[in-house]
Amino acid sequence: MLEAYRSHVAEREELGVPPKPLDAAWTSELVELLQDPPKGEEDFLLDLLTNRIPPGVDEAAYVKAGFLSAIVKDEASSPIVDKPLAVELLGNMLGGYNVSTLIDLLDDQDLAEKAADQLKNITLVFDAFYDISAKADQGNSLAKAIIQSWADAEWFNSKDPVASEIKAVVFKVSGETNTDDLSPAQDAWSRPDIPLHAKAMYKMQREGLQPEEPGAIGPMGQIKAIKERGLPVAYVGDVVGTGSSRKSATNSVLWFFGDEIDGVPNKNSGGICIGNKIAPIFFNTMEDAGALVFEAPVEKINTGQVIKIFPYEGKITDESGEILSEFEMKSDVIFDEVQADGRINLIIGRSLTQRSRAVSYT
């Protein structure tokens, strides 16, 4: 498995992209190796388990959750993954196959407290809420504490709010950018593979951009040079996001200019998107992904320029403090969406908080 995987890594490296996330078959082989690891491969195997398997309800996540559950139930063992680490790794899987095991552990003398700490930060519990509520009704103090934590919105308040001042470097594309510029239809076959698909972003010649391979690969050199400045990148355009492929277009932009998501391979969130005009459905999709997205005049903002964004004051300045643009947020809720790592996360989290307050244990 390791030989095949390293061969895959080398192939992807030649393409300038990271390896694909592990699928269920590779994850099954990884689980076998974790129980009897080849000498010297321990750290590598643990990294694969921690960072290269999609969370949630992916088939590979099912295999991962099953293995970690077996560890905590004494049905499997590994010299690399002990029980406390298994609980921590289950907690990092966002929601889905991990939740039931964490709830079961609330009755475990040794691991209950650690499991509760993980559950406090998971909002994707859905109907499993009732399982925790039932334990609380039966007198389980940790179950009560989890529901109180959700009621207090600790899942939200533990995250950093949007800063009052953000220093960023600009990547600006003049004119209209439609979703086909960001996610070309003729490259639709690669959309599930976000890093590979993103290479086609802006692959056609246009003012200010130098595609690496016109018609095939976009301006990777220019993007790399901007990112090497070491600041957050503000993606800026005159008109941004017209067209229908808003999800894959957003994925492409954020692959280059967003933030890595812990434990989620090959997908980014966050980022900054500014447009004189932004298509509503693209705007909404950026919100879903946790981007700080807003409309503002951009004629005084140029590629390579270092700017300071004052989100609450509604202004953008250059480094000397000269005002380049003034704006108004569509809604102050966008600050909560960014803090929650996305609009969908905020909606789900708020719903959980409301349910918890209805049965809150004080």
Q: Which residues does each predicted region cover?
A:
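Structural detector for internal amphipathic alpha-helices that build alpha-solenoid repeat scaffolds
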Residues: 15-20, 42-59, 73, 80-95, ...
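Conserved phosphate/anionic-ligand binding catalytic regions in large, soluble enzymes, centered on
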Residues: 177-183, 239-252, 333, 337-348
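N-terminal, positively charged, Ser/Thr/Ala/Gly-biased leader segments
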Residues: 143-192, 345-358
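Amphipathic alpha-helical packing elements
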Residues: 2-31, 36, 337-338, 346-347
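Eukaryotic acidic, Ser/Thr-rich intrinsically disordered low-complexity regions
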Residues: 2-5, 126-156
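Conserved small/polar residues in nucleotide/adenosyl-binding loops
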Residues: 362
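Feature captures the catalytic cores and cofactor-binding loops of soluble hydro-lyases/lyases
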Residues: 189-317, 321-326
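Amphipathic alpha-helical scaffolding segments comprising HEAT/armadillo-like alpha-solenoid repeats
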Residues: 24-32, 55-74, 94-107, 124-136
